[in-house]
Amino acid sequence: YFTAYRIDHILGFFRIWEIPSHSVHGLLGQFVPALPMSVDEIQSYGLPFQKDFMTKPFINEEMLNKMFGDKAAFVKETFVQHVHDDIYEMRPEYDTQRKVEAYFSDKKDEESIHIREGVYALISNVLFVPDRKHPSMYHPRIAVQNDFIFGRLDWKEKDAFNRLYNHYYY
């Protein structure tokens, strides 16, 4: 018999991944303690900071149709509202994952679960998360490179974001 301890993720002993109480998934979390980034610091990587585009869920017609198919009309009527052109935003009554979770609490069928998970993904479709103590400072959202909002960036912006992301997380 051996007396041994295996320590995985040593950073976990010093920094904790904090998930906001309004979130179900961890994508909108941030390390605590952490050094959030200022707008100037973000821009120093060559990424022009656009607060609304980068910190509010990016939702457009194409995305809704891709994610929800024939249920896109239901999602538009229930969870999002039209802003302009083909852009939507979350309705205030469903603007957090916990609010969406409450809506689906008694709906356990496969279709409802698919829609619920899709709406969760809409809410987390941001490039940056405001710091919980300093809202004018930001954390790059974890694992955003496979989301729709990242796809909206041009190649220079993607490169700048990835350099910033790698510096921040690694």
Each predicted region: which residue ranges?
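Catalytic cores of glycan-processing enzymes that make or break glycosidic bonds
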Residues: Y1-Y170
